[in-house]
């Protein structure tokens, strides 16, 4: 089973996303990636955030757990404690090949929470909805569990 750890960082009414252009598709995802052997999902989330955005964060709490076929994705609400946005050093940047459409490009970006409902290309939609609703409703008391199956 593949385990991923992803982060939700909100500051000044904006959320950090990774803008992706891949194989002629344009979409946004939350920063994150695979959990390495011997690593907890929390440790992976912190590492991935720094690799992909250049920001150092601390975990506040788990927001969601998404089960999708043979993978589990953990989404954590985080708080920034340092770093420089856009200075990520992950292989997405150091080994990027803009001429390879299968690999695509990664662009760390900020998006206003109020704009999230206008975009149908922010994934996963369940986490985007949680972030957008946090403005008025706050965060759920317990992590949201989502189970999806391939159709």
Segments predicted by a language model, with ranges:
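Active-site beta-strand termini and strand-to-loop segments that position acidic
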Residues: 9-12, 20, 78-80
């Amino acid at each position: 089973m593949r385990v991923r750890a992803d982060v939700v960082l909100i500051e000044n009414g904006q959320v950090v996303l990774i803008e992706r252009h891949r194989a002629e598709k344009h979409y946004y995802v939350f920063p994150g990636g695979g959990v390495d052997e011997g690593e907890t999902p929390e440790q992976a989330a912190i590492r991935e955030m720094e690799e992909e955005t250049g920001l150092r964060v601390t975990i506040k709490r788990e927001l969601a757990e998404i089960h999708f076929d043979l993978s589990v994705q953990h989404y954590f609400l985080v708080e920034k404690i340092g770093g420089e946005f856009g200075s990520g050093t992950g292989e997405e940047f150091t080994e990027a090949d803009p001429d390879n459409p299968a690999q695509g490009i990664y662009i760390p970006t900020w998006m206003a929470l109020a704009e999230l409902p206008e975009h149908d290309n922010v994934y996963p939609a369940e986490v985007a909805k949680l972030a957008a609703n946090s403005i008025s409703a706050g965060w759920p008391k317990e992590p949201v569990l989502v189970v999806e199956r391939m159709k």
